[in-house]
Every structure is written in C-alpha cells, then in structure tokens.
C-alpha cells in the first residue's frame, strides 16, 4: 500500500510541474488542433465512402 502511495505522490509532483510550468497550456493547444484535424478527416472519409456507395459502418 505504501508503494502505491509513493507512486501516486510522484505522479502528482510530475503533473504539478507540467501544469505550473506552462507545458500543459501548449499541450492543450496542440490537442485542440489535432482534434479538429482528425474530425475533418473523419468527415472526409464518411463522405468519400458514401459517394462510392459503400456502407459507412
């Protein structure tokens, strides 16, 4: 049980360093961009499959 507590304590320290260091803001911006890129690719794929007459699912 002490091992788990130590593991989560170390994870909390790493998360705090990343969060307070400004890295989290940059990572969130990149994640937002990637979300919209992959959303656009999903829509393009569905449209292309629908135009070819194939089933979407």
UniProtKB/Swiss-Prot annotation:
The chain crosses the membrane at residues 4-24, 27-47. It is a multi-pass membrane protein. Its main location: membrane. Pfam families: DUF1328. It is found in: Cell membrane. The keyword Manganese does not apply. Keywords: Cell membrane, Membrane, Transmembrane, Transmembrane helix. GO terms for cellular component: plasma membrane. InterPro entries: DUF1328 (IPR009760). The keyword Nucleotide-binding does not apply. Belongs to the UPF0391 family. NCBIfam families: PRK13682.1-1, PRK13682.1-3, PRK13682.1-4. This is UPF0391 membrane protein HNE_2348. It comes from Hyphomonas neptunium (strain ATCC 15444).
């Amino acid at each position: 049980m002490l091992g788990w507590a130590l593991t989560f304590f170390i994870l909390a320290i790493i998360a705090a360093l990343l969060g307070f260091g400004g890295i989290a803001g940059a990572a969130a911006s990149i994640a937002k961009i990637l979300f919209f890129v992959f959303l656009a690719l999903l829509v393009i794929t569905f449209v292309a499959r629908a135009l070819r007459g194939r089933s979407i699912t």
